[in-house]
Amino acid sequence: MPAMKVAVLGAGAWGTALAGHLAVRHDTVLWARQPALIADLRASHENARYLAGVALPPALRYETDLNAALDHALADNALCVVATPVAGLRGLFRAMRDAGKVPAHVVWLCKGFEADSQLMPHQVVAAELPEHGSNGVLSGPSFAREVGQGLPVALTIASASAACRERTVAAFHHGAMRIYTGDDVVGVEVGGAVKNVLAIATGIADGLGLGLNARAALITRGLAEMSRLGVTLGGRAETFTGLTGLGDLILTATGDLSRNRTVGLQLAAGRTLDDILGGLGHVAEGVRCAQAVLAIARAHAIEMPITQAVCAVLFDGVAPRDAVSALLRRDSKAE
């Protein structure tokens, strides 16, 4: 496929890194609502706030006007990439609808559940754009900084639309980035949400010095929690042993570039959640969606003790070591 027109909506670390990758091959525009951020990007071709030290391609263009960015994605050979957190997803799709500028092919990158509604991202999109069919989620084990540096990465595009899958592969599958395809949107989104919560748990355990045995147990039993929830919600079991399940969980739980793991490490060190989030400078989706994950699990009578322990530490004032002790006191059971 020839060069495409791509609009990336959201200039955080992940949106910036992917826009840089796309601009190597395609006519790419990166949109953000903050004029000062866009001015800095135009002047330096570096996102000093969210991805400092990563040089962006000279061909990448920047835009603060959402309508102009959407116009770019309305071309025949175009793709719209939504790189906002879950909290901003509904508002952005509503703005597309209200402006009458809905791109034909849209993929989103966010991981989590909408806090108030407890909806998955694809459900939020369907609520705002019920007639839109060529859309999906791009996910997998990936740190923005490594992608920005051109290091190898493998991601999955999950969509019910073959056209969306093909368009996404055509846009992203080049250089050091490999794209796999599938249609299990539910499984991919559940994996992306739950792994962030589990990464907080692993960070707590590592911060308490509980050792590699404990880390392996948390990852493995956490994967079981993820799979139970995902299959109940309509995902396929095999999705959770793939890139967007086990792969993303391993990366986020063990990699020190992980914001969610960092939250766990710092909670174990005795810092308060407000203090941690204030100094993080980026969104930690595991904190935002932990309560939604637990509420959904309880509504379906699904046992998720690790997720419950994370929520107890985050929101109920339970000390990290006490939460671990409560997990260890649980009765033995069949694996």
UniProtKB/Swiss-Prot annotation:
| Family annotation (PANTHER family) | GLYCEROL-3-PHOSPHATE DEHYDROGENASE, GLYCEROL-3-PHOSPHATE DEHYDROGENASE [NAD(+)] 2, CHLOROPLASTIC
Query: HAMAP family per the record?
Result: NAD_Glyc3P_dehydrog
Catalytic activity, as annotated: sn-glycerol 3-phosphate + NAD(+) = dihydroxyacetone phosphate + NADH + H(+); sn-glycerol 3-phosphate + NADP(+) = dihydroxyacetone phosphate + NADPH + H(+)
Name the gene behind this protein.
gpsA
GO molecular function terms attached to this record: glycerol-3-phosphate dehydrogenase [NAD(P)+] activity; NAD binding
EC id: 1.1.1.94
Which keywords annotate this record?
Cytoplasm, Lipid biosynthesis, Lipid metabolism, NAD, NADP, Nucleotide-binding, Oxidoreductase, Phospholipid biosynthesis, Phospholipid metabolism
Q: What is the lineage of its organism?
A: Bacteria, Pseudomonadati, Pseudomonadota, Betaproteobacteria, Burkholderiales
Does the record carry Cytoplasm as a key word? yes
* InterPro entries assigned: 6-PGluconate_DH-like_C_sf, 6PGD_dom2, G3P_DH_NAD-dep, G3P_DH_NAD-dep_C, G3P_DH_NAD-dep_N, NAD(P)-bd_dom_sf
Q: What is this protein called?
A: Glycerol-3-phosphate dehydrogenase [NAD(P)+]
Homology family: Belongs to the NAD-dependent glycerol-3-phosphate dehydrogenase family.
Q: Which GO terms describe its biological process?
A: carbohydrate metabolic process; glycerol-3-phosphate biosynthetic process; glycerol-3-phosphate catabolic process; glycerophospholipid metabolic process; phospholipid biosynthetic process
Q: What class of enzyme is it?
A: oxidoreductase
Question: Which subcellular locations apply to this protein?
Answer: Cytoplasm
Natural source organism: Paraburkholderia xenovorans (strain LB400)
Q: What does this protein do?
A: Catalyzes the reduction of the glycolytic intermediate dihydroxyacetone phosphate (DHAP) to sn-glycerol 3-phosphate (G3P), the key precursor for phospholipid synthesis.
Catalytic residues as annotated in Swiss-Prot or TrEMBL: 195
